């Protein structure tokens, strides 16, 4: 399953607020479709699937990528669910979003893909790069790059920068000091349900 490129509000109407996907809020709270208002009891599978879809759409990754992250999270010490969130939060496109360099994660991914971002002084165009403690993330020293990020920093997608990212806003540079703590994950998610969803699939 490839990365989603369709209407974003349709997704938020179905799954709820996804700050990484879009800033806009759905005007109608009921799910899309002819029977969006109908209330019916959902199965446990449907509930787990919905939580999994929240992660996919919020972080803008494909099913194949998410499966890889789940496998990697399992191999790490500690809670698989927490590890999974830390891995997703550590992606370069998400870090740029959390710093305010991009308006959303897709917007931040474009910044990275188009060569506007540097890591440790070198241009890096790999959005999935896993940022680690000690990395310096910055907007490239180029007028066009600075202008793009400047406008986004004035109106960041999220109000607060997580404490593991030390941002120097005037210089458009930041230092990564560790992993994102669970309480600073912006999306409302039950990661245990995601782990359960993949328990028999991966």
UniProtKB/Swiss-Prot annotation:
Pfam family of the protein (one): S4
> S4 RNA-binding domain: which residues?
90-152
Entry GO terms, CC: small ribosomal subunit
Cite the InterPro entries for this sequence: Ribosomal_uS4, Ribosomal_uS4_bac-type, Ribosomal_uS4_CS, Ribosomal_uS4_N, S4_RNA-bd, S4_RNA-bd_sf
Out of the domains of life, which is the source?
Bacteria
The record's listing under NCBIfam families reads:
PRK05327.1 (NF003717), rpsD_bact (TIGR01017)
Which protein family is it in?
A: Belongs to the universal ribosomal protein uS4 family.
Q: What does this protein do?
A: One of the primary rRNA binding proteins, it binds directly to 16S rRNA where it nucleates assembly of the body of the 30S subunit.
Name of the protein this chain belongs to: Small ribosomal subunit protein uS4
Species assigned in the record: Prochlorococcus marinus (strain SARG / CCMP1375 / SS120)
Q: What is the lineage of its organism?
A: Bacteria, Bacillati, Cyanobacteriota, Cyanophyceae, Synechococcales
């Amino acid at each position: 399953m490839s990365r989603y490129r369709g209407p974003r509000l349709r997704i938020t109407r179905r799954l709820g607020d996804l700050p990484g996907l879009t800033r806009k809020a759905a005007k109608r709270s009921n799910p899309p479709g002819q029977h969006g208002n109908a209330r019916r009891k959902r199965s446990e599978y449907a509930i787990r699937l919905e939580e999994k879809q929240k992660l996919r759409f919020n972080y803008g990754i494909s099913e194949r990528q998410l499966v890889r992250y789940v496998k990697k999270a399992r191999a790490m010490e500690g809670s698989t669910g927490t590890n999974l969130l830390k891995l997703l939060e550590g992606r370069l496109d998400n870090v740029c979003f959390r710093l305010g360099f991009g308006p959303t994660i897709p917007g931040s991914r474009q910044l990275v893909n188009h060569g506007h971002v540097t890591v440790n002084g070198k241009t890096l165009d790999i959005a999935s790069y896993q940022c680690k403690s000690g990395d310096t993330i910055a907007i490239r020293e180029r007028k066009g790059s600075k202008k793009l990020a400047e406008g986004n920093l004035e109106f960041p997608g999220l109000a607060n920068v997580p404490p593991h990212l030390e941002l120097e806003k005037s210089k458009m540079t930041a230092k990564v000091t560790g992993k994102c703590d669970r309480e600073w994950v912006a999306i409302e998610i039950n990661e245990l349900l995601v782990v359960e969803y993949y328990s028999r699939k991966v």
